[in-house]
């Protein structure tokens, strides 16, 4: 999701162009999402991402410099902002690398919101190891699903994480579609990358990595506000599941790389 206006402003995040994203219609309860607005030099990175995709789809080879606007004054800013994109045409899994790097940097806490939790072994291991090492790892996922089978696979991934000490909450008012990480109040990312195989390895995605930027406090505050509206999930709940539901989830996990 990329929107660039005149080369001076850029938006990205989880928000698509559809009525439910603005809660103009209700499909899965309250739709909770996030996005980030960029100004300044970082906008050029988003412009190049869009133009690269445009040229790939249209079979063009344009001179991108003609789309670069004259420099404009921007507000004083502290910290670092780095937009990034991920593409299946490149063997490097950029989105996964960003997430794994952030998890590895954590000393105190990790706050994550994701609509889907269908993680590969590396990501699952990183989250579990962080929790076992004393880092407070908090995950918020939806309580009302948009895709039932994906929801069941997401829940099938809960037990190993809960057993390692990861705190998992479900957003009870509806469907949370935000894809955010916050680490120790110093690092954050907002973008389109879900914690699932398709998003990490098969889709065209993008995001913005932040370090010591003032808006990180806004992202963290939004997480805390969302947490108050979410229900904690306990491991005990999964130890007494209906055997047929356990079998159903186990079968679905086999197809996790396709989800």
Tell where the protein language model's regions lie, with residue ranges.
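Charged, low-complexity intrinsically disordered terminal segments
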Residues: 1-259
């Amino acid at each position: 999701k990329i929107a660039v206006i005149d080369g001076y402003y850029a938006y990205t995040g989880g928000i698509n162009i559809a009525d439910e994203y603005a809660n103009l219609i209700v499909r899965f309860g309250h739709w909770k999402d996030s996005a980030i607005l960029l100004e300044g030099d970082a906008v050029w990175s988003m412009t190049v991402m869009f133009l690269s995709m445009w040229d790939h789809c249209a079979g063009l080879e344009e001179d991108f410099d003609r789309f670069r606007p004259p420099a404009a004054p921007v507000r004083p800013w502290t910290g670092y902002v780095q937009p990034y994109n991920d593409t299946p045409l490149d063997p490097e899994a950029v989105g996964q690398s960003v997430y794994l790097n952030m998890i590895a940097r954590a000393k105190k806490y990790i706050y994550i919101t994701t609509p889907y939790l269908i993680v590969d072994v590396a990501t699952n291991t990183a989250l579990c190891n962080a929790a076992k090492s004393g880092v407070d790892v908090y995950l918020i996922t939806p309580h009302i699903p948009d895709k039932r089978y994906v929801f069941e696979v997401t829940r099938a991934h809960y037990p190993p994480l809960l057993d390692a000490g990861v705190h998992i909450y479900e957003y009870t008012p509806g469907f949370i579609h935000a894809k955010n990480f916050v680490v120790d109040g110093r690092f954050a990312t907002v973008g389109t990358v879900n914690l699932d195989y398709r998003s990490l390895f098969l889709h065209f995605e993008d995001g913005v990595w932040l370090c010591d930027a003032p808006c990180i406090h806004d992202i963290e505050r939004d997480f805390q506000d969302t947490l108050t509206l979410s229900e904690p999930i306990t491991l005990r709940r999964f130890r007494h599941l209906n055997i047929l539901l356990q079998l159903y989830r186990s079968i679905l996990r086999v197809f996790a790389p396709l989800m």
